[in-house]
Design a protein with these regions (language model features):
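Residue-level marker of intrinsically disordered, low-complexity segments enriched
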Residues: 9, 34-37, 144, 207
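Residues marking helix boundaries in flexible regions
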Residues: 12, 40-43, 71
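N-terminal Lys/Arg-rich, disordered targeting/topogenic segments
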Residues: 1-27
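Hydrophobic membrane-insertion alpha-helices, especially the h-region
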Residues: 31-48
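Catalytic glycan-binding domains that act on GlcNAc-containing polysaccharides
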Residues: 48-218
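Extended, non-globular alpha-helical segments
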Residues: 19-20, 27-36, 90, 107
Length: 218
């Protein structure tokens, strides 16, 4: 009787241990699945959060303000709005009251240039530092230079370094082979300027940007 009981006890013990091992395997499997699911969710959330953070950083680095003024006066002068946006980014980074040694405003106009082109536009009582006025005059100046040189890069060089310098460079075979386009710009600042404006054009065509209300930014 004792032997029979002992045999049954061992059988029950083995069955219990097998059930225990199965429960432990199921538990480990469930824990593994939960861990994988948690990792997946964290990675997914990180990707989404990272994307949104990247977009926010992009918006900060590449903002657009006064967009309706830019669109209006770019269209009035047959200019690519992205060109105007890129130029303003390089000139003032959309700071309306930005000033350098000689120029001011969003498109960094000198008082002399603003006065010359304001007359051509029929403006009498004006403030060239006003955002709308600055963009209006600046777009007209840029369009005039593109018309004069029939080349955007040459026009950008003239916008930065002045028409007199560019005209002299075009006459120099070291800088121009045809007298119309510049294959080398002797001023390093102007070379960098033209390069950066072109880079910004491509960036703004692909980046999500802030479209700010004009009056809000004034």
């Amino acid at each position: 009787m004792l032997k029979t009981y002992t045999t049954k006890s061992r059988i029950f013990q083995r069955q219990y241990e097998r059930r225990k091992r199965r429960r432990e395997r199921r538990k480990r499997l469930i824990c593994t699945i939960l861990a994988i699911a948690t990792i997946f969710l964290l990675v997914y959330a990180g990707c989404i959060g990272g994307k949104k953070l990247g977009e926010k950083i992009s918006e900060i680095r590449y903002p657009v303000a006064y967009s309706s003024y830019i669109t209006e006066y770019a269209n009035d002068n047959n200019l690519d709005p992205y060109l105007v946006i890129a130029l303003i980014k390089q000139e003032s980074n959309f700071v309306a009251d930005a000033r350098s040694e000689y120029a001011g405003g969003l498109m960094q106009l000198t008082e002399v240039t603003a006065e010359e082109y304001a007359k051509k536009l029929g403006l009498t009582d004006y403030n060239y530092m006003d955002p709308e006025t600055n963009i209006k005059i600046g777009c007209y100046v840029l369009a005039s230079m593109i018309k004069k040189y029939d080349n955007i890069d040459t026009a950008l060089a003239a916008y930065n370094a002045g028409v007199g310098n560019v005209d002299n460079w075009l006459k120099n075979p070291d800088y121009s082979s045809d007298g119309k386009t510049l294959y080398y710009i002797p001023f390093s600042e102007t070379r960098h300027y033209v390069k950066k404006v072109n880079q910004y054009i491509e960036i703004y065509k692909t980046q999500a940007v802030i479209q700010s209300d004009n009056r809000k930014d004034e």
